[in-house]
């Protein structure tokens, strides 16, 4: 039953009837046969443009190397296709040959299995299937039947045996494994290249913790660049304000003597005397000081100190009085330190510029009133000193100093040295008091306290001014004191000393 089924399958495939046929053994089973040999050729793909009217050639070289050349059709544009490969001997594989004319079936042994591949020099892929007389008997395996003296002649009828597939299948697997290994090596190199690119990209994606390294580098390089570029650090307003405050304080602390000497020598060189100007012109001079070194220092000093602290400056700038006058003024300052300290905490950069005109006039009138009271006491002391000096025959030096002080624009520098020393000493003490009374505080927190302290000071200064006006009675209607009265008193003292001589 099994044979019948097999015959039916073969009959269907070969269009053979159901009759029983004889199986003949071919010449290959004869041990003395040296003329007949059957080979199989296996190629990697099936070409389409094969010219079946021409013969193909098989060349077996040394070391089992085989070259197969297949002619192509003229329409393909390529004359032929070349295949190269190796051959292996068969051991148990056979081939059945069916003759349609006679109906005889012959079995033959297979000699070699040839596996070839298309060479890369050719562009198109071609077929290895060769034409023969028994081409219709092909079993679909594409075998080449060669006959000849050496067993490698021209193909006459490709016929496949049932055991051929089982014999060639492992060969095929081995060849494909070799081919696949080669292709895997090539594709493996490509994959390695892709893997090489992936690590380059993957650190970029996964290096978020490692990217902070350049982020940390940039701030380290940025400060050096900012340090070189002073334009980026200078425009910040808080830095400018802080630098100016510290710079002005250092200038006041280090150059107190220079500021005093410069202000004292200003009138000798023709500058305006700050001690003898009115209240309105005194504020105008602060904003419109001449662009000299001494004028700038005086303006910076006046802007640094608050308005209540500036009331000490007219008495300091008012030159032309002896050491007794400066001593009396120093006592006057010691008697009222509490009135000067509260506003001394304000910054002079914006305090004096932000005050109203009415408040400025009130402050200047108060400062001038205090200075006038101090000068009145000093004049009284000077008159008593001049009278006592005339009686003790030592009025020459006092009268000379008074006469020199009365002429402020024409006095020599030699007669002013003792006065300058006393004023320098007093100015240094005032600068130290300012430095001790000016901490680095904000303007916003000081301005309300300054307003309250200013109102308290105004209330305290009103009865004091009334007492001074009642005692002195020599003030002008505009809040200032006339310079003519002071000069007349000084001239009277000098004349009395001359008469005594």
Swiss-Prot record:
Signal peptide: none annotated. GO terms for cellular component: nucleoplasm; super elongation complex. It is found in: Nucleus. Residues 138-149, 173-192, 271-283 have a biased composition (Polar residues). Keywords: Activator, Developmental protein, Nucleus, Phosphoprotein, Transcription, Transcription regulation. Residues 393-408 have a biased composition (Acidic residues). The keyword Phosphoprotein applies. GO terms for biological process: cellular response to heat; positive regulation of DNA-templated transcription; transcription elongation by RNA polymerase II. The modification Phosphoserine is found at residue 202. One of its GO terms (molecular function) is transcription elongation factor activity. Residues 200-221, 256-270, 302-314, 329-343, 416-437, 455-471, 483-501 have a biased composition (Low complexity). Residues 138-226, 256-501 are annotated as: Disordered. Pfam families: EAF. Its main location: nucleus. Belongs to the EAF family. This is Ell-associated factor Eaf. It comes from Drosophila yakuba (Fruit fly). The lineage of its organism: Eukaryota, Metazoa, Ecdysozoa, Arthropoda, Hexapoda.
């Amino acid at each position: 039953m099994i044979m019948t089924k097999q015959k039916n399958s073969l009959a269907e495939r070969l269009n053979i009837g159901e009759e029983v046929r004889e199986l003949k053994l071919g010449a290959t089973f004869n041990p003395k046969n040296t003329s007949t040999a059957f080979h199989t050729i296996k190629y990697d793909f099936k070409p389409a443009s094969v010219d079946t009217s021409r013969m193909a050639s098989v060349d077996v070289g040394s070391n089992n190397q085989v070259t197969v050349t297949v002619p192509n059709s003229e329409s393909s544009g390529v004359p032929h296709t070349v295949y190269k490969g190796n051959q292996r001997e068969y051991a148990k594989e056979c081939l059945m040959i069916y003759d349609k004319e006679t109906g005889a079936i012959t079995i033959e042994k297979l000699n070699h299995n040839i596996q070839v591949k298309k060479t890369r020099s050719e562009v198109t892929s071609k077929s290895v299937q060769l034409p023969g007389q028994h081409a219709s008997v092909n079993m679909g395996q594409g075998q080449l039947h060669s006959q000849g003296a050496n067993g490698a002649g021209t193909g006459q009828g490709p016929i496949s045996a049932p055991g051929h597939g089982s014999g060639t299948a492992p060969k095929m697997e081995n060849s494909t494994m070799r081919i696949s290994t080669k292709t895997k090596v090539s594709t493996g190199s490509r994959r390695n290249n892709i893997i090489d690119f992936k690590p380059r990209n993957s650190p970029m994606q996964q290096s978020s913790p490692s990217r902070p390294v350049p982020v940390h580098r940039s701030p380290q390089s940025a400060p050096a660049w900012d340090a070189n570029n002073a334009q980026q650090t200078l425009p910040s307003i808080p830095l400018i304000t802080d630098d100016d405050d510290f710079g002005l304080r250092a200038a006041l602390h280090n150059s107190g003597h220079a500021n005093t000497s410069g202000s004292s020598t200003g009138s000798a060189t023709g500058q305006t005397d700050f001690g003898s100007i009115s209240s309105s012109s005194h504020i105008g001079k602060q904003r419109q000081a001449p662009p000299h070194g001494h004028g700038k220092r005086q303006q910076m000093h006046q802007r640094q100190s608050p308005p209540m602290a500036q009331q000490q400056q007219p008495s300091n700038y008012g030159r032309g009085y002896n050491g007794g006058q400066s001593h009396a003024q120093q006592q006057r300052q010691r008697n009222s330190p509490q009135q000067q300290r509260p506003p001394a905490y304000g910054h002079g950069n914006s305090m004096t510029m932000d005050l109203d005109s009415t408040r400025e006039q009130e402050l200047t009138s108060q400062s001038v009133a205090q200075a006038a009271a101090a000068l009145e006491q000093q004049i009284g002391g000077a008159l008593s000193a001049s009278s006592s000096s005339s009686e003790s025959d030592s009025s020459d030096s006092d009268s000379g100093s008074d006469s020199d002080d009365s002429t402020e624009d024409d006095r020599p520098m030699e007669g002013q040295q003792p006065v300058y020393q006393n004023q320098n000493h007093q100015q240094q003490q005032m600068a130290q008091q300012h430095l001790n009374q000016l901490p680095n505080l904000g303007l916003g927190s000081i301005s309300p306290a300054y307003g309250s302290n200013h109102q308290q000071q105004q209330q305290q200064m009103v009865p004091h001014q009334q007492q001074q006006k009642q005692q002195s009675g020599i003030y002008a209607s505009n809040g200032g004191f006339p310079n003519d009265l002071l000069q007349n008193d000084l001239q009277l003292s000098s004349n009395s000393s001359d008469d005594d001589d």
